[in-house]
Structures are given as structure tokens and as C-alpha cells.
Amino acid sequence: GASVLIRGKSSWNDAPVLYVVDGIQVNKEAFDAINIDEIENISVLKDASAAVYGSRAANGVILVTTKRGENGRPKFSFSTNLGISTPTAYPELLNAYEYATLWNEAQTNMGYDINNSSDAHLFYNDEQIQKARTESSDWFGETFKKHSLNQKYNMSVNGGSDRIKYFMSLGYLHDEGMYDGIDYKRYNLRANIDAKINNYINVRLDLEGMESTLEQPQVASASLFEYVVRRSPLEKIYNADGSYYDMGSRHPVAERDDSGYKRNKKNNYRAKLGFDIKIPYVDGLKFNALFSYVRGANHSKSFLTPYSLYLLGDDGSVANERIFGKTSLSEEMYIGNNMTSTLTLTYNKKIKGHSMSGLLVYEQFESLGSTLGASRTNFPFTSIDQLFAGGDDEEQSNWGTPAQDARKGLIGRFNYEGKYLAEFSFRYDGSLKFHPDRRWGFFPSVSLGWRLSEEAFMKKFSNLDNLKVRGSYGILGNDAVGGWQWLTNYSFGNAYIFNQAPIKSIVSGGIPNVDLTWEKTATFNFGVDASIYKGLLAVEADVFYK
């Protein structure tokens, strides 16, 4: 999929943009899987304001808000989208006649002489060139489609009363690839429910699920394209009996249809429970609690099968068979879950046109998962794509990897808004990836603004709605490194014979780095906002340095 950069890269590590969906941080894979019909709003944080999102916000933040219920009778909606995808440009490949003509020209340019008997075999003769006028293989057209179909369906309902509001949706996406064998299907389910318990307590329950399946041929797209453009249009694609013609190297169509498959199945289920509480007797003081639990699984299966290319004799019998590849099966399963807890205390006060607000947040994230995989080779037949059907026990392997991650953070923010604007925020984050003595980092940010349009000396400009200058400075932290580098890691190495028995060796993974800690990104931004004629024309200009 496409990658996103906000104001360029600002990290030595490949730290991605941070995605936040309904207040919960998610990875890019979860963001890509969102049904677009469920999205209410998307916004981008690109300056010091991203500091409040902490350790993964060094390259900016994309905020997503999903749709919620509205007062009124149930409103049903159904939408469907059908589309056709086509490449923006096809490579202009030579036909057989052009290829043969240019080939002969190239041989001449290299100093060979078609009239010299010792060089004649390097050239296409007149008979072959005339045959090339009518017989030409279109490798690209035979391997790739000119267009593919994609379709999307979505059904939703929303409604509610003063007490309970709901939004529910069900989506289905089906996308074909640009060559046979590629097929992607995805199902999305969402239910957002809001309940008003009393005048002080509101409860939110969000449930969502996603299941997807991607099937594709064993050959990679880039490799398949390379095989196609390297083929000569003078080479046959098929023999007269329909078998694959042996041109001496890998056959693009056979690679697509008969080299095996790769299948990836994913599912993610998320539950979020939120409480919004107005503190009695203290005007403007609110408490918010948000808890999220995600359960995900990923099952990948790769089955490699051999295919045969043939040369036929004049009588149509097989003169030579060439086999590419051998059978092998690899399966891997990942199961993981993560939990996020966010507790927020906010206070808002307005005094004589001046607004002040404060915020204090405690955030905790924990992720646990494990991967288990196995592979076997030399299957006696390809009709059963299961591990038990593999060949020799000596050519089988298995592996497993645990995964753990955790973060804690304390966030504070104070905001003053009026003619002059000021905001100070900080995060105090801890990451399990670092040594206990290097685990915590402090990341502050400050923003200042001045509404010039509120000043008396600007009142003479009656058509000026707003003129504001602003500046911000913030430090962001990044922990996008491998975990446990502050410990000495060991792995199994080669086996050696001791007392007539093989003994596995243990190999050190390197010198531990106890000094590894947060990578920091400093961001400075200066901007001007202006609008005139009741917002008819608005301008926003920014200069930033990272």
C-alpha cells in the first residue's frame, strides 16, 4: 500500500505516521482496513501540537473520527460502487518482426557480418523474418489483464433518542488484481452506541470487526513483470498441444498459473468502552475513561509447486521436459492482543471573554503476541496442501517468536484563549524497549498566538474577519527500535559433534546497549491565518523547521 509522510522524514528509524481512530492509537494496517463509509472526519497534526500524542508522533498524526448515531427514527443507507482498474501506461514492447530486424541491426553494429558463414548463425534469416511478420507472441497481453473489476458494498443504519443513539454498518470489498490469481476480499462490521445514563454520565460502546483474505500466485509481481519484458516475441508461449513451450528459462504464464499460491487471512476484533463524567458541583470539570481491547490473528500459507516446460518433436511427441521448482509448504500463524487504557481529567473555564482549559491524562498500552510457523518440502504429490503430506522428515522445520510491548505516559496541557493564545503541553513517557534507567523521556511543547484582528488599531479594516500570527515549538520522542537491545540475546547456531552426538551451539547476538534511549525530534513552526469578506477568502501560510 501507499506510505504517508507528513512534512518529510524526521527520524533515523523508519517511524511511521501515527494513526489515532476515535481516541485510540492504531497501526497503519488497521487504518488501511477501515471502511471509508464509516469515517466522519479526518484531520492531520503536523507541528508541535502532535507532542501530546507522545512516543509515536514524531512524524505527525492522522486523526480519524468514525460516524455516530443521531436523534430520530432509524435511517437506513445502502451504497454500492463498481469500478474498473487499468494500468496508467503499458510498456511498448516490440513485435516479432521489429525484434528480429533490430536484433540483426545490433549484430551488425557489433561487427558481425550476415554474409560471413561463420557469423550467419547469429542473425535471423529472411525466412525467419518473413515468418515474424505474421507470428508474434504477446507475452504482456497473455500474462496481464487490460483491466480488473473492483466492487464495494455498504449498508448502515443510524438513529436514536435522547437516551440512546446508535450507528451500525456492514461493508464488503472485493478487488481483483491485474493478473489472474490475485483476489482480495474484506468484510467490515461496526457498531457505535452512545447512552446517556443521567445528566452527569454518558457511556460509549464501540464494537468493530474486520476479516480479509488475500490470495495471489507464488511469483512476486515485480518478478513476473521482469520475466515478461525479458521474453522475445519470437518465442512461442504454448506448444501445439497447449503445453508450455520451453524457451530455456522461467515461463511467465506458468509462473502465474502453476507455481503455487500464497494466501493470507487476517481478522481483527476491537471493543472500546468509554465513560464521560461531569463532576458534580465543579463547573467545567470532567473525567473521561476509555478502555480498548483488540484481538487479532494472521494466518499465512505459501505452497510452492513445480511446473514443466516442453519441447516437442516433429511428430508432436515430447522431446524434452524441463521442471522448474520443487514442492514446499510454509505456514505461519500470529495471534496477539493489545489493551489500551486512557484516563483524562479536563477543566474549562471562561471569564469575561477569556477561555482557560487544563488537561491531565494517564495512558497505558500493553501488547502481547506470538508467532508459530512450520514448513516441509518434497511433497510426493501436490493435490494435498497440508503439512502432514510433506516428504522427508529431515527437510522440515518449525519456529516460534513471542512479542511484547508496553508503554506508559502522563500528559498535561494548559490552554489560554482570547486575544492572545497560549498553550503548554508535555508528555512523560516510558517504554519497555529501553533499559530501566533510560526508559522515561520528557517531551514538552509550547504554542503562542496573537489575534491581530481583535486589536483596536485593526478595526478600520472592516472586511477583515480574522488575522492571526502563531508559533510553536515542541520536542517529540520516538521508540521505533527493536526491543530488549539492552539485554544480551542468544540464538541457536550450528551443531557440533561431542561424544559422537550432535550438540547445538548457542551464539551471542551481540553486545547489549544499555545506553539506548529515546530518539528526539524538535519541531518549530511559524504561521499566519487570515480571512476576509466573512470567510469568502481564507489564507493559511506556514514555515516549519524539523
Region annotations inferred by a language model:
Residues 45-48, 53-59, 65-68:
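Periplasmic N-terminal soluble interaction domains immediately after the signal peptide in Gram-negative
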Residues 6-10, 21, 46, 66-68, ...:
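Flexible glycine-/small-residue-rich
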Residues 16, 186, 192-201, 205-211, ...:
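Extracellular/periplasmic, surface-exposed regions of secreted and cell-surface proteins
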Residues 28-29, 51-52, 176-180, 431-436, ...:
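A generic structural signal for short coil/turn motifs at secondary-structure boundaries
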